[in-house]
Amino acid sequence: MPQISRYSNEQVEQLLAELLNVLEKHKAPTDLSLMVLGNMVTNLINTSIAPAQRQAIANSFASALQSSINEDKAH
């Protein structure tokens, strides 16, 4: 069941496009892109979430990420 977001699809898509443009501008390979994005998530959690909630937020994020992974074999 999809979650309802307080953000519009337009807001999400615009920010996603801008982030992808930065990665493409720097010709970042997939592994570097994932490393940088992972570090960004870690930094956001550590600087914006109360310590008592960080583990739960990280677990929720990891679960949502795993649920969104496409299983088809196309590369």
Swiss-Prot record:
Pfam families: DUF1414 (PF07208). HAMAP family: UPF0352 (MF_00816). Belongs to the UPF0352 family. This is UPF0352 protein YejL.
